[in-house]
Regions:
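N-terminal alpha/beta PP-like core and its mobile active-site loop of ThDP/TPP-dependent enzymes
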Residues: 1-328, 366-369, 449-452, 470-472, ...
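Thiamine diphosphate
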Residues: 98, 106-107, 112-113, 305-307, ...
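Short, internal active-site loops enriched in acidic
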Residues: 162-165, 380, 528
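Phosphate/pyrophosphate-binding active-site segments
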Residues: 171-173, 191-195, 291-377, 503-507, ...
């Protein structure tokens, strides 16, 4: 069928089952936007900034497991996507970024709004295409979807010069792109791991974000319960195993639950399931699981021995690997080890700062751990990881690897549109809110029912906390004293504004906000001296943790 590059792009998006795209138009994507105008099967969400559009595509992907799509024009439009693309790359989230560019004949001439965006994004994408007339736009976009979902998921960029979008292209409908099949785990690797597990007296499962992106949660639950092995999660792994489960120990790492960290310190076998041993969890082998043999299961061989040297590696799909290992082993008991962990919990209870704990525990109870919980970055993020009880996978959407402030608002828009049947709540700080508050206009325009909870302490809390602990209280540039009336700002955008002046008001305010089928912003006041605790100092371990 005779078509154009722009029309072929839209047709391939329809092939892939895309129903929502996020973006911002410009001169280099006029042909693409003209075809979008003619298409009534794809909803376009116009954000106020391209970075928010990229975060929205990412939030959509994380909430649904499907590939998110973002479109931007050339030059500054494309470069504004980079932070969002990098956030998706660091957390293995599948998005396809479509950018326009100047005509092919002008590439390399420093033309108006020309940027080599394929080159710029090469370090933070799985692959970057520059569409050409020889291959055709359709083939590039199909491959982009396949690459984004294959193996370790991640972002792919397709840069389409304006003349390629406008020129004639033959289009033939094709089936939806399928990800490449994951490698089957090697029998010898499985047998070695099974032998190590049979000998272990104090095993611990350390779960990362790979358990969620691979859909391995059910296999993980079956594996842990059959073998009676306790489970600790990185922040990205939260939700992969229910917080209410008996074997769940909580968050592990710098701000982790003391019981989870003590279990890591004392275990004799650590099974890393889809985890990358981030320095926020494992600063070194000497400080993290120093007594343990380590089995590392991952779909990406590049993760093996990158941060922590392991004793056994299993390359392959996590769910299939856990199923095969479970079938090779008899049921476990580990009663003595679980008794030790119970003693850890009794001896070192986790800190519960009144305001953050009360606010987030109340929210967790009201939503029963089932909401789409999106966070920004900083203290708000860590308090959420500590005190909200996640009961299902894909319920926490946060910028873990990149730690991008301003991530939350865009990601919440994407999550709410991707999973409208679940309530979406954004937990942000006043710093992240100020970075992205223009997207209140997007919430208002499309009536996207996100509850935005601003943990408002009037400071850049996490950096200020470090300055207090490690820099003798020299608060350099972390006390902006903006004095913004956040509820009034929300009202100016046509969004309902509410306030929590005291944590005792949280239940009443949350009940009202959650009952509304429209966006709401809640200004929740927090003492600026309220810290994220415990806190393991850089280079330290659980024995050097700060508790007050």
């Amino acid at each position: 069928m005779n078509s154009t590059g722009a029309r072929a792009l839209i047709d391939v998006l329809l092939e892939q089952g895309v129903d929502t795209v996020f973006g911002y138009p410009g001169s280099a994507v006029l042909d693409i936007y003209d075809e979008l105008y003619k298409c009534d099967k794809i909803r376009h969400i116009l954000t106020c900034h391209e970075q928010a559009a990229a975060h929205a595509a990412d939030g959509y992907a994380r909430a649904t497991g499907r590939t998110g799509v973002v479109i931007a024009t050339s030059g500054p439009g494309a470069t504004n996507l980079v932070t969002g693309i990098a956030a998706a790359y660091m957390d293995s989230s599948p998005i396809v970024a479509i950018t326009g560019n100047v005509k092919t004949s002008l590439l390399g001439s420093d033309s108006f709004q020309e940027v080599d965006i394929a080159g710029v994004t090469m370090p933070v994408t799985k692959y970057s295409f520059i569409a050409s007339g020889e291959r055709g736009v359709a083939q590039d976009v199909r491959e982009a979807f396949s690459i984004a979902q294959s193996g370790r998921k991640g972002p792919v960029l397709v840069d389409i010069p304006a003349d390629i979008a406008a020129q004639s292209e033959e289009y033939e409908r094709a089936p939806k792109s399928e990800p490449a099949p994951a490698k089957e785990p090697e029998k010898a690797e499985l047998e070695r791991a099974a032998q190590m597990m049979e000998k272990a007296k104090r095993p611990l499962i350390y779960v990362g974000g790979g358990a969620i992106s691979s859909g391995a949660s059910d296999a993980l639950k079956t594996f842990a319960q059959k073998l009676h092995i306790p489970v600790a999660c990185s922040m990205m792994g939260l939700g992969a195993y229910p917080c209410s489960a008996e074997l769940f120990l909580g968050l592990v790492g710098m701000h982790g639950n003391p019981a989870a960290n003590m279990a890591a310190l004392n275990c004799d076998l650590l099974i890393a399931a889809g985890a990358r041993f981030s320095n926020r969890v494992a600063a070194s082998k000497e400080s993290f699981a120093p007594k343990a043999k380590i089995i590392h299961i991952d779909i990406d061989a590049a993760e093996f021995d990158k941060n922590i040297i392991s004793d056994a590696h299993i390359l392959g799909d996590l769910g299939k690997t856990l199923e095969k290992l479970s079938a090779m082993l008899p049921p476990g008991e580990n009663s003595e080890w679980l008794g030790e962990i119970a003693e850890f919990k009794r001896r070192i209870p986790r800190p519960k700062p009144y305001a953050p704990y009360t606010v987030l525990h109340t929210l967790s109870e009201l939503t029963k751990g089932e909401a789409n919980i999106v966070t920004d970055v900083g203290q708000n993020q860590m308090w959420t990881a500590q005190y909200y009880d996640f009961e299902r996978p894909r319920s926490l959407i946060t910028s873990g690897g990149l730690g991008a402030m301003g991530f939350g608002m865009g990601a919440a828009i994407g999550a709410a549109l991707g999973k409208p049947e679940r309530k979406t709540v954004l937990i942000t700080g006043d710093g992240g809110f100020h970075m992205s508050l223009s997207e209140l206009a997007t919430l208002s325009r499309y009536n996207i029912p996100v509850v935005v909870v601003v943990m408002n302490n009037g400071v850049l809390g996490m950096v200020r906390q470090w300055q207090k602990v490690f820099y003798d209280g020299r608060f350099s540039a972390t006390q902006p004293e903006r004095g913004t009336d956040i509820a009034a700002v929300a009202k100016a955008f046509g969004v309902k504004g509410m306030r929590i002046k005291n944590p005792s008001q949280a239940k009443r305010v949350f009940k009202k906000a959650l009952s509304m089928d429209k966006p709401v912003v809640i200004d929740c006041r927090i003492d600026p001296d309220c810290a994220v605790l415990p806190m393991i100092p850089p280079g330290g371990d659980i024995t050097t943790a700060i508790y007050k």
